[in-house]
Amino acid sequence: MARRRRYEGLNPFVAAGLIKFSEEGELERIKLTPKSAVVISVALIAAILVLNLIHPL
């Protein structure tokens, strides 16, 4: 529970450790919602799987 409270006000990407920023204000430049990030990652994984099926190493 303590971990959840500590990350309560943070962006989900920063809280998950997916994005690290050294300067304040860098986060505002990215206009990506968590829902769109999930959609993009699923599409990327699907594309990689299709490419592996078409042309295996």
From Swiss-Prot:
Asked if the keyword Protein transport belongs to this entry, the reply reads yes
Q: Which GO terms describe its biological process?
A: protein transport
For this UniProt entry, which segments traverse the membrane? 34-55
Where does the protein principally reside?
membrane
**Entry keywords, A to Z:** Cell membrane, Membrane, Protein transport, Translocation, Transmembrane, Transmembrane helix, Transport
A cellular component annotation (GO) from this entry: plasma membrane
Subunit composition?
Answer: Component of the protein translocase complex. Heterotrimer consisting of alpha (SecY), beta (SecG) and gamma (SecE) subunits. Can form oligomers of the heterotrimer.
Write out the function statement from the record: Involved in protein export. The function of the beta subunit is unknown, but it may be involved in stabilization of the trimeric complex.
Protein known as? Preprotein translocase subunit SecG
What is the source species? Pyrobaculum neutrophilum (strain DSM 2338 / JCM 9278 / NBRC 100436 / V24Sta) (Thermoproteus neutrophilus)
